[in-house]
Amino acid sequence: MNRVRVAMIGVGNISGIYLKNITQTFRELELIGVCDLVRERAEKAAAEYGVPKIYDTMHDAFADPEVQIVLNLTRPYEHFEVSRAALLAGKHVYSEKPLGAELAEGTELRRIAEEKGLMLGGAPDTFLGAGIQTCRRLIDDGFIGTPIGSAAYMIGCGHESWHPDPEFYYKRGGGPMFDMGPYYLTAMINLMGGVQRVFSASKITFPKRTITSQPLAGKVMDVDVNTYIAGTVQYASGAIGTIFTTFDVQFPREKSRFIEIYGSEGTLFVPDPNDFSGTIQLYRPEEGVTREIPMMYGYPENSRALGLADMAKALTTGREARCAVQQTYHVLEIIEGFETSARTGCWTEIRSEYHRAPAMARPTIKGILD
C-alpha cells in the first residue's frame, strides 16, 4: 500500500493521540515530519514515534516536496494562518477544529482550496466512530420514525483546572461553542441533516478566571468570549433542535454531555460526541422501556486521525473525504450564526449547503478505510 505522507504542525496537548494513531493504526498514513514553536516538543515526539524529520518552521514543511497533507494541530486562532500558508504552498490540509476563528477565514480557505484543486477538511472525526455511526443507522432504518427534533448539552466548568496552558480557550476562536460545539453540531447534522437557520442567546458569566493547574497555577485570565451559550437550530427538514454549551457550570460529568434525537415513533439517546463510542439507548412506547443498543460499527476506541486517514483514502481513490470542508464550513457558519443571533436578537440564516457523507463500511478492518 502506498501511504500518504503527512507533516504535523503543532505538537501540543492533542497531538499525542494523533501521533499514536498515525504511526500505529492507520495504514493509509505515513508521518514524515513534525514542527512546533517549541522545538523540544517536536524533538520529543519525533524520538518517541520514530518520525524522521523535524522542521524548523512550518514553511520548511510546506516546502518539502515529499509532504502531501499538512495536519494542522495549532491553537484555534492560528488555524487560518497555518492552513492558508499550506494551501498556497500546494498542500492538502486537515485541520483540528474549528476551520477558522470566523466565517470569513473559512470562506478564504475554501476559495483557495477550490481554486488550487486541493483537499481541505478537518476535525471532528468522532462522528465516524462506532457510536454516532450506529445511531445514524438506527435513524436511517426508521427505528424512531421521522426525526422531529433534537437536544444537545455540553455542561462543564472550563479547562483551567486541568489543562497546562488553558488561556486560549477564552480568547478569539475559543469558548465552549467553538471548542466543544463542533463535536455536537457535526454529530447533529450527520444524524439530522443540514441546518437552515439559528437563534441564540449568550453571555460571559465570569470576566476573569484563575488557573489552578500546573505550571501556571495562580495566573488570572481575562475572558474575551461568551462562555454560556444557548442556541436553537432549524434543520432543512423542518425539525427543530436545541444546543447548550457552557464553561460556567458545576455539574456531574456523567449527566453533562449528551444528545437526544426525538422521532415520531421513539427517542434515541446518543452518546457523548467527543468520544467514538458510549452507551446508546432507544425508547419506543410499545416496548415501555429504554433498551441499550450494541455498537454496529468499528472504531469504538479513541481513533482521532480517522478523518485524516479517510482523507488520505479519498486522495488516492478520487472520492470525497468524509470530513471535507463542506462539513467543517457548515459547522463554522452555524457557530458564527449563533454569535450573530445573540448580538442582533434575530434569527440568522445559514447559507451554506450540506450533504451527509456516506456511512462507514461494515464490517470494518481496523486501520484500513473502505
What are these regions (language model features)?
Residues 1-49:
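N-terminal Rossmann-like dinucleotide-binding module
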Residues 17, 297-308:
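Active-site loop of classical SDR/Rossmann-like NAD(P)-dependent oxidoreductases
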Residues 30-31, 290-296, 313-331:
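Glycine- and charged-residue-rich phosphate/anionic-cofactor binding loop of Rossmann-like
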Residues 53-65:
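Short acidic low-complexity segments
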Residues 69, 75-127, 142:
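Beta-strand-loop-alpha-helix segment that lines the small-molecule cofactor/substrate pocket
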Residues 118, 145-149, 340-370:
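C-terminal capping/lid region of NAD(P)-dependent oxidoreductase domains
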Residues 126-222, 345:
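Predominantly a Rossmann-like dinucleotide-binding segment in NAD(P)-dependent oxidoreductases
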Residues 186-279, 305-317, 321, 337, ...:
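Contiguous beta-strand/loop segments that form the cofactor/metal-binding neighborhood of enzyme cores
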